[in-house]
Amino acid sequence: MTPEEVLEEFRSAGALLQGHFILSSGLRSSTFLQKMTIFSDPARTERLCRALAEVITARFGRIDIVVSPAIGGIIPGYETARHLGAKAIFVERDPGGPFTLRRGFSIPAGTRAVIVEDIVTTGLSARECLASLKDEAGEVVGAACLIDRSGGRGAIGLPLLSLVTLDIPTYAPDALPAELAAIPPVKPGSRALSKP
C-alpha cells in the first residue's frame, strides 16, 4: 500500500480533518487524523493493518507478540498481530499513572515483540509503553504505526516504522499562528478521559 493509498483511506472515510484541534499531547494542530473513524470500518482496518504487518515483517522478520498502548492502539495492534500470526497484548494505565502490563500478559524470554500504535505525534505513548516493558524477558525489536505525523521526529528509543510519515505542524497553546488562533479549538482525542 503506497502512502497516497493510505491517505486516501483516511480521506474517503472522512477521517482527515481540518480545523483547530487540541491533540492528546496538549499541542495544537490544524489537521487531525480521526483514527476511530477508520477503526469503525473492519474492512478498512484490515487493509491498513495488513499493509503495516508487511512493513513490520520486511524490517524485523519474525514477530511473536504485538504490544499496544490502550485505548487507541488496541484495535490496530490486534489486527496487525492477526496478520503477523502473533499474539496481541496491551498495556494500560491506572488513572494518572504509568502504563503497566497486566491481565496476565508478558513477553517471555526468547520472544520478539513489536509495539504497534495508531498515530504517532510526539512518540509519548510509545515511549511510555516501551518503559513499561523494561523488565520483560523477551526482546522488543521496534515500533510501528499507521501514520507518523511527527515528520520522523517522534523518537521513542527504538526504530519506528510507519505506512506514511507526514510533517504536520503542531503548536504550543501560547504560540499559535493567527489563522489557527481565530478558530475555536476542539479536543477530539482520548488521553484526557483517564484524568480525574
From Swiss-Prot:
Enzyme class: transferase
EC annotation from Swiss-Prot or TrEMBL: 2.4.2.10
Reactions listed under catalytic activity: orotidine 5'-phosphate + diphosphate = orotate + 5-phospho-alpha-D-ribose 1-diphosphate
Protein name according to UniProt: Orotate phosphoribosyltransferase
Family, similarity comment: Belongs to the purine/pyrimidine phosphoribosyltransferase family. PyrE subfamily.
GO biological process, any: pyrimidine nucleobase biosynthetic process
Functional summary from the UniProt entry: Catalyzes the transfer of a ribosyl phosphate group from 5-phosphoribose 1-diphosphate to orotate, leading to the formation of orotidine monophosphate (OMP).
The organism's place on the tree of life at top rank: Bacteria
UniProt GO MF annotations: magnesium ion binding; orotate phosphoribosyltransferase activity
UniProt keyword terms in alphabetical order: Glycosyltransferase, Magnesium, Pyrimidine biosynthesis, Transferase
Native source species: Methylorubrum extorquens (strain CM4 / NCIMB 13688) (Methylobacterium extorquens)
UniProt KW Signal keyword: no
Cofactors named for this entry: Mg(2+)
